[in-house]
Amino acid sequence: MKAASREALATVESKLDEFLSGDRSVATATQAGQDLFEVVRVLDGDRELRVALTDDASTSEERKSLVQTLFGGKVSPVALQVLQEAAAAQWSTPRDIARGLIILGRRALLRGAEFEGKLGQVEDELFSLSRVLDREGELTQLLSDRTATSDRKVGLLASVLYGKVTMVTEALALQAIGRPEQNPIDDLAGLADTAAKLQGRTIARVTSAGELNDSQRAALAEKLGKIYGRAMSIHSEVDTSLLGGMTIRVGDEVIDGSTAGKIARLRAQMA
């Protein structure tokens, strides 16, 4: 997104948080998220509507009135308010309003998880799912198949997830899989990152030679928190080629404590 769209999105995100913060209702937040996803489906298939909702030749009030006419009574009150705020904003391109509504729908669902006290669980589930797809090449290939319809891919993933994750994780994952222009692995990992940031946490990407258990992850998060002076989320995966130890990436900083890294440094010194 260009600057104007980023500014528009930030403004509407703030409004969304304001709308949801009143009663902090899980049901209100999740319904708003689902409704925004449905509106995106409409916009994806209607370029003229995207143009009308972002037309600078009309006033913001006229665009808000159009939203009321089209979606009033068809979506939840919060979703309608968000749509009106989005229509009133200035977007760089008509396509960006649809992209923005996806982000807003996801944020609403994550806020719902937060209100329910499950945002940390959703973060872990989303990241774990991204790693499962990374390992399960056949499943990922099926979900990334551009010849398959979105409905077919969503149905496949729904059968895999049913009863195994929270409702919010399932809704976010199914929506992500339904976006054919996105890599599902990266999209799910990005959603996990967003969940961490909403909790005020910094992400530490940990690659270890063996699986970390919960106590090891907690101890590592506490240790890194003391080093960086802020709460940390551990997103870990296994790479047996490290031979032992682990590597840790926080932002642009990398700490390489792996056996493979030590061997490589020793070889470099001896060369």
UniProtKB/Swiss-Prot annotation:
Record keywords, A-Z: ATP synthesis, Cell membrane, CF(1), Hydrogen ion transport, Ion transport, Membrane, Transport
Compartment(s) of residence: Cell membrane
Superkingdom per UniProt: Bacteria
InterPro entries membership: ATPase_OSCP/d_CS (IPR020781), ATPase_OSCP/dsu (IPR000711)
One Pfam match: OSCP
Subunit organization: F-type ATPases have 2 components, F(1) - the catalytic core - and F(0) - the membrane proton channel. F(1) has five subunits: alpha(3), beta(3), gamma(1), delta(1), epsilon(1). F(0) has three main subunits: a(1), b(2) and c(10-14). The alpha and beta chains form an alternating ring which encloses part of the gamma chain. F(1) is attached to F(0) by a central stalk formed by the gamma and epsilon chains, while a peripheral stalk is formed by the delta and b chains.
This protein's name: ATP synthase subunit delta
Species whose genome carries this gene: Corynebacterium aurimucosum (strain ATCC 700975 / DSM 44827 / CIP 107346 / CN-1) (Corynebacterium nigricans)
